[in-house]
């Protein structure tokens, strides 16, 4: 899955995510066949599943990195060779029209970053509320989270300083830097919606998980250490698995 003429390098951080990747890799392979996707970079944080073999089997580039999504994304983006980066979580599901939305942005908004609208694989009222809040937050405050994906031109990514090598809040740090570097207009919403897993909300409860997300963001804004936040957020002795970090709230 490599075409040096295509513009888009897709970077996916993983941690024991081999079983969940197939539904994401299939549309990316279609994007490669269409001349949009240049490469897929899997930035792994020390999985004990067969992710390396899976990457080799589908023609993706495998990058081993220290565990922690910020560190993995920093390594994956450093290894990527395309003029555009698309960062996706392993449990993201792309819509049928994703290629058109991404290609349109690349053609008409070459200096700006973009994110997808969000929904969950759950059609309950709490799921719709949390996704609606995430989309409103992104529009009003220019603050999409990582599970909405991030499409960014390499020059803007580099000017903004790239992903910080921290365990949590790496997505917030980067979009904050993009706004400071290039202004609010440099962060746009794509005209389509990705779907992400609601498992973490179903496990913890929609209210509890949403409140925890907001409290974590507030503590970060007040200067809390991201490593301490990650430990408190995920619980002592539990790691930050890919696709199981903060959600739409």
Which residues does each predicted region cover?
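Hydrophobic helical membrane-anchoring modules
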Residues: 1-3, 176-249
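Cell-envelope/extracellular polymer assembly enzymes that use nucleotide-activated donors
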Residues: 7-9, 39, 173
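Short, well-formed alpha-helical segments that are part of the catalytic scaffolds
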Residues: 16-32
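Short beta-strand/loop segment that forms part of the nucleotide-sugar
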Residues: 25-29, 36-46, 63-65
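A conserved acidic beta->alpha catalytic loop
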Residues: 44-52, 92
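Short aromatic/hydrophobic "clamp" motif used to bind/position activated sugar donors
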Residues: 85
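Conserved donor NDP-sugar-binding/catalytic core segment of glycosyltransferases
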Residues: 96-126
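A short, conserved alpha-helix in the catalytic core of glycosyltransferases
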Residues: 156-160, 166-186
């Amino acid at each position: 899955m490599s075409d040096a003429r295509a513009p888009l390098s897709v970077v996916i951080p993983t941690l024991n995510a081999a079983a969940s990747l197939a539904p994401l890799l299939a549309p990316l392979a279609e994007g490669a066949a269409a001349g949009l996707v240049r490469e897929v970079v899997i930035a792994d944080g020390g999985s004990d599943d067969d992710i390396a073999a899976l990457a080799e089997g589908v023609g993706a580039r495998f990058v081993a990195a220290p565990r922690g999504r910020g560190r993995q994304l920093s390594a994956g983006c450093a290894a990527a060779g395309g003029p555009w980066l698309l960062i996706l979580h392993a449990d993201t599901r792309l819509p049928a029209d994703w290629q058109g939305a991404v290609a349109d942005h690349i053609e008409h908004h070459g200096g700006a970053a973009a994110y997808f609208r969000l929904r969950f694989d759950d059609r309950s009222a709490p799921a719709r509320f949390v996704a609606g809040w995430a989309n409103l937050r992104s529009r009003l405050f220019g603050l999409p989270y990582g599970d909405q994906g991030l499409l960014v031109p390499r020059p803007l990514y580099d000017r903004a300083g790239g992903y910080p090598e921290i365990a949590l809040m790496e997505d917030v740090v980067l979009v904050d830097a993009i706004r400071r570097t290039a202004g609010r207009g440099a962060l746009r919403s794509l005209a389509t919606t990705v779907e992400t897993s609601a498992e973490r909300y179903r496990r913890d409860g929609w209210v509890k998980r949403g409140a925890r997300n907001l409290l974590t963001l507030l503590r970060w804004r007040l200067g809390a250490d991201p490593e301490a936040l990650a430990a408190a957020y995920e619980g002592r002795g539990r790691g930050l698995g890919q696709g199981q970090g903060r959600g739409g709230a």
